[in-house]
């Protein structure tokens, strides 16, 4: 079984590819994605479950991002930063089994790895605001 960090990185990579290929359906993108990211079936199922849930809430998540990005539009965000924010907001709002502080920290670390140091700070600021407005506690999870 792969780590949750690796799941998150694969999701960000997938979301980036999906962002670059607008109009392509989730299932078609997944078929192409697995050609370059071979995993065992159980790990694929875990990643796909997260991705299907993200796709279900993607429009609401993007609206949430728009509401927090001041004097900026979603289209002007660096695509990788947008993908990291989508994942982080999904976890904070929809994954009650993951403490939000963990989601924020993981998102910041992924931003530092795949984007810039400044992106890490930007992602942290946006996700912290989302957390505060969500009413969840930073270390609260509900199994």
Curated annotation (Swiss-Prot):
The organism's place on the tree of life at top rank: Bacteria
Family annotation (InterPro entries): NusB-like_sf (IPR035926), NusB_fam (IPR011605), NusB_RsmB_TIM44 (IPR006027)
Gene3D superfamilies: NusB-like
Pfam families recorded: NusB
Signal peptide: none
Biological process annotations from GO: DNA-templated transcription termination; transcription antitermination
Keywords: RNA-binding, Transcription, Transcription antitermination, Transcription regulation
GO cellular component, one term: cytosol
Gene Ontology molecular functions: RNA binding
This protein's record includes keyword Transcription: yes
Primary role: Involved in transcription antitermination. Required for transcription of ribosomal RNA (rRNA) genes. Binds specifically to the boxA antiterminator sequence of the ribosomal RNA (rrn) operons.
Family to which the UniProt record says this protein belongs: Belongs to the NusB family.
Protein name (record): Transcription antitermination protein NusB
Organism the protein comes from: Methylacidiphilum infernorum (isolate V4) (Methylokorus infernorum (strain V4))
